[in-house]
């Protein structure tokens, strides 16, 4: 869970505050939705324990980003799905990114930034 709010008379920036205590889950994603899979991955980074995701094949941008940032993620490729395991992340190295295109392409980076300890809010 998270709470969302806006600053100064309902203007941007959007403020997202995560729950203090999340529990890890086992999640079965069978629609091939990279957005659903990524959402659970990001939540798993804040959850106690190990979050396990069994996901139908879909875009792997979030997985590649997690590996690039050396986050505690493991991916096993199966015939019809991927099994992703992710542990709680205490710190995410902050980086500057230039993200072209539409907002949906940058949504994952926005969430990752919000989860980062040194992000400006």
Place the predicted regions along the sequence by residue.
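Structural preference for solvent-exposed beta-strand-turn elements
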Residues: 1-121
